[in-house]
Amino acid sequence: MTAVETVLGSITPNLLGRTLTHEHVALDFEHFYRPPPADFESELKAKISMSTLGYVRLYPYSSKENVRFYDEEALEAAKKDVLLYKKHGGGSIVENSSYGLKRNLEFIVELAKSTGVHFIAGTGHYIHAVQDASHASLTVEQMSDLYTKDILTGIEIKGKMVKCGFIGEVASVYPIHEFEKNSIKATGEIQEVLGCGVSFHPHRDAQAPFDIMRLYLEAGGRAQKCVMSHLDRTLFKIEELVELSELGCYLQYDLFGTECSYYQLNTNVDMISDGQRIENLMKLIEEGLLDRLLMSHDIHTKHRLTSYGGHGYHHIHTNILPRMFARGVTLEQVEQMTVTNPANWLSFDP
């Protein structure tokens, strides 16, 4: 019988409820720090406060405090927001911190116990540049063994084995580094054997998602169990999204709440707004792709938590869904994207 593997054990898919499919509650994002503009250097070096928050929102990766999403203040703020998410109807969170991002599995388990929200943890590797020597030298076979162990046996946390419930986020740059090609291949091989869900983080080049899918499918991975993340900053034309969907993967809009058009990690494009995200999802529904759509926030910096003036994990539930209903999206369609699709993606029978 198929089930979903949470950090507290297996559950039936119908218990997930509304699910955020791409979030982080603790990770190290300091690799992506960018030096601040000279005009705002002092403001972005200062502690995040009401007087500096405007600068941090414009240049989120130029505040070292902001990208340290792992200290005690961040963990306390994340827990507060998970409780708010629960209060506003949230059921489950898929935590996408993989090897290289310093995933805090002990904290994830504690959150699941203390908040009542189901957490699904991921295995897999982030980009080569953030790996330590012990992981950077892994072969495809060694990666496959590691992912299998994390899913079937688990990782020991305080004397108990905690199992991962999917492979992700599996990240790559562009052109794809050889290490990252190996991690994609290992992901495809293990997905074919175990039947688990997987989630990919593509680079910001429009060709990246297609190259990832080619490597994954060639390795034996099943397209229907694969999520392509961050499409709201990667593919901007509906035609491109439809073309990607023809490969069979889920299309994930996971930057809801990011409303700053200036995108520090790719200054050649403008980040779309929540309004545009809603519009694009509605167009994709019209294209007959309702059963391939997922929504999330990808919170990975402090300024997006409510304690730091942000929107929190409940933003989609409290702000986005009412806007979608007002524009004609039905409850049945919302349930498909936020309940049914996540459950179908995450459920497997190893």
Swiss-Prot record:
Answer yes or no on keyword Hydrolase: yes
Family matches, as PROSITE patterns:
PHOSPHOTRIESTERASE_1, PHOSPHOTRIESTERASE_2
**Binding residues annotated for a divalent metal cation 1, in chain numbering:** 22, 24, 169, 298
Q: Name one GO biological process term.
A: catabolic process
Q: Known SUPFAM superfamilies for this protein?
A: Metallo-dependent hydrolases (SSF51556)
Which cofactors, by name? Answer: a divalent metal cation
Q: Which UniProt keywords apply?
A: Hydrolase, Metal-binding
Co-factor binding details: Binds 2 divalent metal cations per subunit.
**EC identifiers of the protein:** 3.1.-.-
The highest taxon in the source lineage is: Eukaryota
The UniProt annotation places a divalent metal cation 2 binding at 169, 201, 230
Q: Which InterPro entries match?
A: AryldialkylPase_Zn-BS (IPR017947), Metal_Hydrolase (IPR032466), Phosphotriesterase (IPR001559)
**GO MF annotations for this entry?**
hydrolase activity, acting on ester bonds; zinc ion binding
Q: What class of enzyme is it?
A: hydrolase
Which Pfam families does the entry mention?
A: PTE
User: Which family does this protein fall into?
Assistant: Belongs to the metallo-dependent hydrolases superfamily. Phosphotriesterase family.
Give the protein's recorded name: Phosphotriesterase-related protein
Supply the source organism for this entry. Answer: Drosophila pseudoobscura pseudoobscura
